[in-house]
């Protein structure tokens, strides 16, 4: 059974949920092998084994860890050359997609980004599903050249724990001078909000122009659900919420199990960032709002009335 490489997404050895999802997907395609770049492997090993990693390639060279994405792509390209994997799975984050693109060029392979499903292809290979053209179409695709390089959106699979050996192998890589032109000079930890990361959250509650700048009801409802908080571009441009929380074509793309849009009209730019959500709920006073065209459930009403009622109902259900 051919190896399937999974690039580990972690912070100092704390493995993110996206990695357990990718390891679960990798088991559909072959034998999962994790690629761990950076420090903190001892803390990560158990989590990688828990979700089926049979092997872990460790890349700890400062030439890779002290620079931005280019050395990581070079290291992966060398590993692809030696391991000849059936596919490479990478988280579809901003950094992940850049690594994937560089890797595809270096290995002369086909690239698929923002996949929301990955399955074995008919007659071999890999088949993916993704949303394209600002969410206007859902398509299936396969890579026809080289090693399939696939960037997968968070929440594309439910993590399934299966014990793996996680036998580690230290990999020595050579990084070209051309890849070391952007050095990391400082790292600042992100301030904790008490809420899940927007792109990884299973539930996202977003507010738009309809909030009038008051996100308190959106935040209260999100907190009752253990959800992340998002915002439309209109709300961000008005200065009501940080750009780091913007969902849409020029913000972050999310694909949670549940997406709640409160006071958001549903312009195509916003839909491009959330249309692959598994279940979509909208709350809007305007019954003609475009957002109602793609929702699973819609509530025509004032979010300042609807959301507090929903928050109390959630709290009551939790006891």
Language-model features: locations:
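N-terminal glycine-rich FAD/FM-binding segment characteristic of electron-transfer flavoproteins
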Residues: 1-319
């Amino acid at each position: 059974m051919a190896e399937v490489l999974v690039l580990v997404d972690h912070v100092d050895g704390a493995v993110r949920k996206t990695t357990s999802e990718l390891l679960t997907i990798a088991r559909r395609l072959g034998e999962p092998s994790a690629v761990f770049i950076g420090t903190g492997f001892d803390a990560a090993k158990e989590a990688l084994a828990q979700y089926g990693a049979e092997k872990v390639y460790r890349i700890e060279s400062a030439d890779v860890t002290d620079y931005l994405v280019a050395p990581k792509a070079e290291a992966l390209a060398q590993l692809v050359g030696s391991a000849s994997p059936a596919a490479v799975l990478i988280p579809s984050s901003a950094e992940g997609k850049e690594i994937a693109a560089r890797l595809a060029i270096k290995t002369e392979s086909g690239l698929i980004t923002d996949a929301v499903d990955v399955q074995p292809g008919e007659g071999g290979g890999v088949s993916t599903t993704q949303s394209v053209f600002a969410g206007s179409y859902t398509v299936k695709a396969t890579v026809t050249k080289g090693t399939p390089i696939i960037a997968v959106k968070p929440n594309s699979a439910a993590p399934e724990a299966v014990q793996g050996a996680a036998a580690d192998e230290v990999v020595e890589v050579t990084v070209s001078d051309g890849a070391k032109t952007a050095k990391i000079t400082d790292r600042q930890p992100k301030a904790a909000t008490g809420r899940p990361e927007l792109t990884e959250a299973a539930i996202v509650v977003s507010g738009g122009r309809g909030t009038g700048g008051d996100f308190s009801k959106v935040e209260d409802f999100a907190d009752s659900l253990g959800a992340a908080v998002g915002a439309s571009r209109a709300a961000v441009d008005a200065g009501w919420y940080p750009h780091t929380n913007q969902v849409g074509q020029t913000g972050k793309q999310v694909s949670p199990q549940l997406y709640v849009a409160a006071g958001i009209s549903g312009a195509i730019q916003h839909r491009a960032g959330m249309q692959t959500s598994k279940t979509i709920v909208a709350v809007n006073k305007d019954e003609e709002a475009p957002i109602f065209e793609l929702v699973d459930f819609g509530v025509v009403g004032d979010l300042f009335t609807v959301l507090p009622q929903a928050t109390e109902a959630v709290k009551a259900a939790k006891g």
